[in-house]
Amino acid sequence: MSEKKEARLRRARRARAKIRELGVTRLAIHRTPRHIYAQLISGDGSTVIASASTLDKDLRSGKTGNADAAKAVGALIAERAKAAGVTQVAFDRSGFKYHGRIKALADAAREGGLEF
């Protein structure tokens, strides 16, 4: 495994440990060059409450690897979180920089009513 990936996973592990101590619902993000995924995971980590990604039927037709697609995923996860009764979450960026697509998703989720 490359040093860059190891460093990202180390950052992710530290952040998840801190979130686990809080025991709150977390918004976990995963990013690949082509797609972006978001999951709401319960405080104990046992269940996925809601999920959204660029692989969803409504989002799959357009471009999937850009900031506009990330905004759409952020709005969709916020909508599904509200439907599940979740308003407050901890943002788990999985060790990725808070920039670009990650930031676009987070901003759209905040606009949709999620509180970080």
Swiss-Prot record:
Annotated GO MF terms: 5S rRNA binding; structural constituent of ribosome
Function comment: This is one of the proteins that bind and probably mediate the attachment of the 5S RNA into the large ribosomal subunit, where it forms part of the central protuberance.
A GO biological-process term: translation
Gene3D superfamilies recorded: 3.30.420.100
SUPFAM superfamilies xref list: Translational machinery components
Cellular component per GO, a single term: cytosolic large ribosomal subunit
InterPro entries: Ribosomal_uL18_bac-type, Ribosomal_uL18_bac/euk
Identification of the protein by name: Large ribosomal subunit protein uL18
Organism of derivation: Cellvibrio japonicus (strain Ueda107)
Alphabetical list of CDD domains matching this protein: Ribosomal_L18_L5e
Alphabetized Pfam families for the sequence: Ribosomal_L18p
Assembly mode: Part of the 50S ribosomal subunit; part of the 5S rRNA/L5/L18/L25 subcomplex. Contacts the 5S and 23S rRNAs.
Family under the similarity heading: Belongs to the universal ribosomal protein uL18 family.
Superkingdom, taxonomy of origin: Bacteria
Annotated keywords: Ribonucleoprotein, Ribosomal protein, RNA-binding, rRNA-binding
